[in-house]
Regions:
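Structural/interface elements that position substrates and couple domains in central-metabolism enzymes
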Residues: 1-406
């Protein structure tokens, strides 16, 4: 297993490819974006993550990491491509596996006997089996029969902002379509993983990752629902949670403006889609968290004058990252702009607004926003906002969705 082909060079694929390369494996990273390929081959990065630039530079300079837009033969193929969902007209969500299918079909003609094929992308139960089917379908078109192919699902469990640490130190699950596939995957990840690696079947591994994120989503929904109750009853939710958590067996999370990111805001829907009648609590939690941005928008509109200036602090889905995927903050800004308010967006981790906000909001500095706004909305508790105090916001209306400004 000396050569690897990693398909998808985003937040998961790039760190994974790079760490394998620095451990002596020959890695080809594949991405459909020529700009991403050019950036990585020059030893630079296109995403923000602490110390990732150092890792990628070392991997490229070692000669072990190269990037391309097309796959090449390898001992191991790792799929780390997006798995979003499609929203139907009736509001139902169904998994979109088109990126996984395209990636699998792209390398299928290159496989040889004994190759290991790993799905890292968080996926609905049964996706690893579908990858096997897509590969076999492409081989059939070529009248090729390749024996001994091994398939496994090895979901990532890393947190943006701490990816490189958690990539090494977090336990891993390797679920194979066969025990031999799981064992081979374990041997591969032992290259850099210092934690325990647990073996299981592919379907259990797929559901385990979805379960982890659904569990977190349900707990966040409880906190968010508490915040709605407290707003109605005139209670400080932050004080309430602080006191309730003094109970030795209570650990309530903190509420926020919603839930974002490509994991927690997406993965529970895969369970709901697979078992809609059984996943009632999981569905309700998703609905609670998805509704929270609308509550924040209503609060801001009630506080602002008609056509007033509103400063929205933070666009990322969580603190201290540049990842805007599924961000409730972006959704809130879009709704406020649509309502006719002048929105000043402050996001220290990006240089340009996402396409959905261009022409609808203005990206400004924190000082600029505070000087101009009548309403200040804290959406993300970035370190850059940690020094803000109520005294600095005197004369302005504050909506603090994070309970961070005191």
């Amino acid at each position: 297993m000396n050569s690897l082909c990693v398909l998808g060079l985003g937040y998961i694929g790039l760190p994974t490819a790079s760490i394998f390369a620095t451990k002596g494996r020959r890695v080809l990273g594949v991405d459909i974006s020529p700009a991403v390929v050019e950036t990585i081959n020059s030893g630079r990065i296109h995403i923000q993550e602490p110390d990732l630039d150092v890792l990628v530079r070392a991997a490229v300079q070692s000669g072990n990491l190269k990037a391309a837009t097309k796959p090449a033969p390898a001992d191991v193929f790792i799929l780390a491509v997006p798995t979003p969902f499609i929203i139907a007209a009736d509001g139902s969500r169904t998994p979109d596996l088109s990126f996984v299918e395209a990636a699998a079909r792209s390398f299928a003609p290159l496989v040889e006997a004994g190759n290991l094929i790993i799905l890292e992308s968080t996926s609905p139960v049964g996706t690893t089996e579908k990858v096997k089917g897509w590969v076999e379908d492409e081989l059939a078109k070529l009248n090729r029969q390749v024996d001994g192919l091994l398939y496994a699902h090895c979901p990532e469990r890393i947190l943006p902002g701490q990816m490189l640490k958690e990539l090494v130190s977090n336990d891993r699950i390797c679920g194979g379509l066969t025990p031999a596939a799981a064992a081979r995957a374990r041997d591969l990840y032992a290259t850099f993983c210092t934690a325990q690696i647990f073996l299981t079947d592919a379907r259990t591994a797929e559901l385990a990752k979805l379960t982890e994120n659904a569990y977190r989503d349900v707990n966040i929904a409880f906190a968010n629902e508490l915040s709605l109750i407290c707003d109605k009853l005139g209670v400080d939710v932050w004080e309430l949670i602080r006191l309730a958590n003094r109970h030795p067996r209570v650990k309530i999370l903190q509420p926020g403006p919603g839930v974002g990111g490509h994991c927690i805001a997406v993965d529970p829907w895969f369970i709901v889609d697979a078992a809609p009648q059984e996943a009632r609590l999981i569905r309700t939690a998703r609905e609670v968290n998805d509704s929270k941005p609308h509550h924040v928008v209503a609060q801001v509109r009630a506080a602002a004058s008609e056509g007033g200036v509103v400063a929205c602090l933070g666009l990322a889905f969580k603190a201290n990252v540049d990842d805007l995927r599924e961000s409730p903050a972006v959704e809130i800004v879009a709704h406020l702009a649509k309502a006719g308010l002048k929105v000043l967006a402050v996001e220290p981790h990006v240089r340009v607004l996402p396409e959905s906000l261009q022409g609808r909001a203005e990206l400004v500095s924190l000082d600029n926003a505070l000087a101009r706004a009548e309403v200040v909305v804290l959406l993300v508790d970035h370190r850059a906002f940690a020094s803000l105090t109520l005294a600095q916001l005197a004369g302005k209306k504050l909506i603090d969705t994070r309970g961070a400004i005191r």
